[in-house]
Each structure stands twice: as C-alpha cells, then as structure tokens.
Amino acid sequence: MYLQQLHLIQFRNYVAQQVEFSAPKTILVGPNAQGKSNLLEAVELLSTLKSHRVSRDRDLVKDGESLSQVTATLQRESGPLDLSLTLRANGRRTVSVNSETIRRQLDFLGHLNIVQFSSLDMDLVRGGPGERRNWLDAVLVQLEPVYAHLLQQYQQVLKQRNAYLKHHRADDAPQLDPQQLVLWNQQLAASGSRVIQRRQRMLMRLVPLAGHWHQTISGHQEQLEILYTPNVSYDPQFPEQLYPQFLSQLEEKSMLEQLQGLSLVGPHRDEVTLLINGTPARQYGSQGQQRTLVLALKLAELKLIEEVVGEAPLLLLDDVLAELDLNRQNQLLDAIQTRFQTLITTTHLGAFDAKWLDSAQILTVKAGQVQFST
C-alpha cells in the first residue's frame, strides 16, 4: 500500500495543508513544535482511529475551530482508496471510504496499515504490563480489525461486572445475587477467552520474527525471549480448556473479588515478559539493548503485517532515527529498503547516514506549513 496524498483542514496547528508523497521515504525536517508529529498523528488516526498522544478529539481540532478533517488518497493492490475522518470538538466523528459514510467506526479499520516507532515505544520495555498489553492489542487490530470489536466487548463486560461488584461491596447495599454473578462470569469468560486466544496466536507468529531480527541487530550476541503469561492458566494446545478454566479461576477468586469490588481474573491482567539472554530487559537491559529490542519488535511487526495482510504497511518513525546508532540505522534501512513506505520526522538531517537521504523526499515543516525542500 502507498499513501499518495494527505490533506489536513483545521487539524492541530494546520489550517489547510495538502501533502503529496513522491518517494518511498519522506523525511519531515524542522524544529520542535512545528507540526511534524502532528502530520504522522493524522496518518495514525486514519489507520487506528486513535491517537497515542491524546484521548480527546477537542485536542486534535485547531484552537478556536469546531471541527477538523483528515483525508488521504491511498493506493492498494485492489485499487485506490479515499479515506476521510471528520473530528468535532464535541467528540462526534464521521468516517467515510470513497465518499461513502461508514456507520460503524470499527468498519473503517483495516484500510490503512501502519507500524509506528517513536521514543515513547521504549515504554514497551521500561513500562508496566499495561504498556505491553496495549502493544499486543494494537498489533492485533492491524492484523485482524474485528479484534477491536472483540476487545471492546470484553472491556464493556469488565466495566459492568466491576460496577456490579463495587455496588454490592457497600455496607448498605443489597446482598449479591449468586445467579446474577454467574451470568457476569459467563460473559467475562466468553469474551475474555477470545482475547487471550488471539493474543496467544499472534505472538506465536511474531516471536520467531522478533528473535531473528534481534539476533541480526545484536550481531548474534544476544538471545531474545518473549514470554506471554495469560492471567488464566491453560495449555494453548488445548484451547477448549480455556473457557472452563476461566470460570474455575473466577470461582476461586470470588470472595476476594467481592471484598475488593474488582475483577481479578482475565486478560486485563495478562503479562508479557521480555528477556535478553534470560535476564529481564526491563530491569537489567542497558539503553542500547532496550533500543535493539524495540527495533526488533517493530521490524517483526512490519514483516508480520505484510505476511497476514498481503501488502506492506506504512512505517512511521517519529523523531527516533537520530537516537539509533549507525549499525541500527543500517539494519533498519536494509529491512525496509524501498518496499515499505516510510515517513520520518527529525529536527536535523545531520544524524542521518547518506544512504537514508538517497532518493528521499525531504519536506520542511514550520509553523503548521509543509514546504518542499530543494
């Protein structure tokens, strides 16, 4: 897939900006706070309908305006696609594909596949379990857009079950109805099992790819292990055991859940452990080792999405390339070549190896305006 054109209207600090992409690599250069990351964020929104920077649409609409619009022309193997997203300060959204309004936003997902790599991704290693769960889920949505619906179902049941437990925890609350709790347990186990199984299946395909890239980048000096520990214990070779095991663990934790007013079993408590040569990378990995690990994960994402979707996704590198040493830059360049369209932001071109600049489209960004560099 290839992003040909992006058009921003009243988005962030852009009033009206159209960008034509004319090369496999586009480098956006300029000082901080000029709008480089905003442009990548617009592409992210068209892919995922989410921003990793903010949660409210009003923060995406230019100050003083009531709505903004992000549109793009994308070339897929099946033909051209026009994608449009209208954001309103009041939170209402409209999405369309080829000028046809899409009623369910979830049906908009899957038209534009991306892999993002920014300095925030170091939290994959350094952050808590929630960071790694969010990463798993984001990759899964790229591979299987229906997963967004399955995850939403689980989160809704979890929220309602927590509210039920919390309500009956109060001293003056009526006694908890065991039959009602059984119904909530069944719903949580059914939707949660689907989430766990998909996470497990995806990692089975991603782990070998990440291991290959990690060995290559580290010069075969380090061994990467990725351990997925579902909160519900079961043998992945026997997936039919997961649902009854889920219910069993809910029964075991029932009294504790009622005391705490909180669901203590389910994929919202899964963990992913990243090990380098058998040692937890979070506590003991050096900064260089952690960067190598995250780069290996991102390259694995690229390859896996390409395998599953059948087309190469876009790669968004947000102010991260200058943080990679020459070896890691070259490994990344060798991996993407010209097959993966890449959008790169940077404050200066001096940190780039000459090979990155060859045949790249270089755009200058200043105060919400994009100019072609000569």
UniProtKB/Swiss-Prot annotation:
Pfam families: SMC_N (PF02463). It is found in: Cytoplasm. ATP binds at G30, P31, N32, A33, Q34, G35, K36, S37. PROSITE patterns: RECF_1 (PS00617), RECF_2 (PS00618). Keywords: ATP-binding, Cytoplasm, DNA damage, DNA repair, DNA replication, DNA-binding, Nucleotide-binding, SOS response. InterPro entries: DNA-binding_RecF (IPR001238), DNA-binding_RecF_CS (IPR018078), P-loop_NTPase (IPR027417), RecF/RecN/SMC_N (IPR003395), RecF_2 (IPR042174). One of its GO terms (molecular function) is ATP binding. One of its GO terms (cellular component) is cytoplasm. The keyword Zinc does not apply. GO terms for biological process: DNA replication; DNA synthesis involved in DNA repair; double-strand break repair; SOS response. NCBIfam families: recf. Belongs to the RecF family. The RecF protein is involved in DNA metabolism; it is required for DNA replication and normal SOS inducibility. RecF binds preferentially to single-stranded, linear DNA. It also seems to bind ATP. This is DNA replication and repair protein RecF.
